[in-house]
Amino acid sequence: MTTTVQNLKAEFGKVGVLFGGRSAEREVSLMSGKGVLAALQSKGVDAHAFDPAERSLAELAAEKFDRVFIALHGSYGEDGTLQGALEQLGIPYTGPGVMASAISMDKVMTKRVCLSHGVPTPRFTVLDAETTSAAQLQSVAAEFGLPLMLKAPHEGSTIGIAKVETAEGMQAGFDLCAKYEAVVLVEQFVKGRELTVPVIGSGRNARALPIVEIRAPQGNYDYEHKYFSNDTEYLCPAPFDEAFTKRVQALAVSAFNAVGCTGWSRVDFMVRASDNEPFLLEINTSPGMTSHSLVPMSAKVAGTGYEDLCIEILRSAKTELKPSSHMQLQEQER
């Protein structure tokens, strides 16, 4: 056993890698979690798999993990609920805390918060999934112009998203998104280039990694192209001049800090073709860590390999609240 392995075991103790879960993004989470687990174990970390869809919070507490790496995506893992449970249990965890996770999981709230901090985002409105009429849909299409992006505000991995290019397609696109949630986000389509910017750290120490540009066939960066296809082209670092690169990276850090993110996240943008203006799309607080994922790709360009990236993220694990005296007493009684 090397000194490095010994040091990591002593530093991190028993580590749980949480992946799988109950959201629509379970399949992606399984891929992310298996990659993270293997990476940590290859570094000598005492890491163990834990699937919250198959095991209870009581079992999580019984494992007595010293910290956990959250590799869950979507509801029940990326939306603040799990983070709250881990706070109650006093287990340090990776990624943003309760509030930042909850805000970032909600595309509507993310847009509102970031707009208030000067980060531009496409024009939008929110429609009720049950009461919106066909006439209202047509009215929105006429007001905003086509094409439009319709989204389920709390889903990710391109799940619950429809691009509507004709007035006749509004109802089908709306129905696709409405089956996931109580409201549907309608967003003005931005024609241009799709970018993503990983951000690592916290507060003043938050730093943006190299920008990744995503070029999917016919611009169709859907679930299949995102995780399984080899047809999508990724350019990292994205081919922009230094001034524009720094501008987008600064916007990414501003958005990250605006919602209160810590540890790591990924900030997605569209750059409008007509005037090269960037627009925030969303913030992912538990980004994918699969073989096709963008954070590892960007980190590699910056000089950090997959295993070392996992270690850096794990090292940032924390709880936001200090354990109460009651929790400290319970710990002493164990």
UniProtKB/Swiss-Prot annotation:
Give the subcellular location. Cytoplasm
Reaction catalysed by this enzyme: 2 D-alanine + ATP = D-alanyl-D-alanine + ADP + phosphate + H(+)
Q: How is the cofactor bound?
A: Binds 2 magnesium or manganese ions per subunit.
What EC number is given for this enzyme?
6.3.2.4
Could you confirm whether the keyword Ribosomal protein appears in this record?
no
Q: What PROSITE patterns does the database record attribute to this sequence?
A: ATP_GRASP, DALA_DALA_LIGASE_1, DALA_DALA_LIGASE_2
Binding-site residues for Mg(2+) 2, renumbered to this chain: E282, N284
Which part of the chain is the ATP-grasp domain?
111-315
Which GO terms label this protein's molecular function in UniProt?
ATP binding; D-alanine-D-alanine ligase activity; metal ion binding
| Main localization, broad class | cytoplasm
Residues reported in the UniProt entry to bind ATP:
141-196
An example of a Gene Ontology cellular component annotation for this protein is:
cytoplasm
A GO BP entry is:
peptidoglycan biosynthetic process
Which pathway does this chain act in?
A: Cell wall biogenesis; peptidoglycan biosynthesis
Q: Where does Mg(2+) 1 bind?
A: D268, E282
- Cross-referenced InterPro entries: ATP-grasp, ATP_grasp_subdomain_1, D-Ala_lig_Van_CS, D_ala_D_ala, Dala_Dala_lig_C, Dala_Dala_lig_N, PreATP-grasp_dom_sf
Q: Does the keyword Nucleotide-binding apply?
A: yes
* Cofactors required: Mg(2+); Mn(2+)
The record's listing under Gene3D superfamilies reads: 3.40.50.20, ATP-grasp fold, A domain, ATP-grasp fold, B domain
What are the protein's UniProt keywords?
ATP-binding, Cell shape, Cell wall biogenesis/degradation, Cytoplasm, Ligase, Magnesium, Manganese, Metal-binding, Nucleotide-binding, Peptidoglycan synthesis
Q: Which family does it belong to?
A: Belongs to the D-alanine--D-alanine ligase family.
The protein's job, in short, is: Cell wall formation.
PANTHER family from the UniProt entry: D-ALANINE--D-ALANINE LIGASE, D-ALANINE--D-ALANINE LIGASE B
Annotated protein name in UniProt: D-alanine--D-alanine ligase
Gene source species? Herminiimonas arsenicoxydans
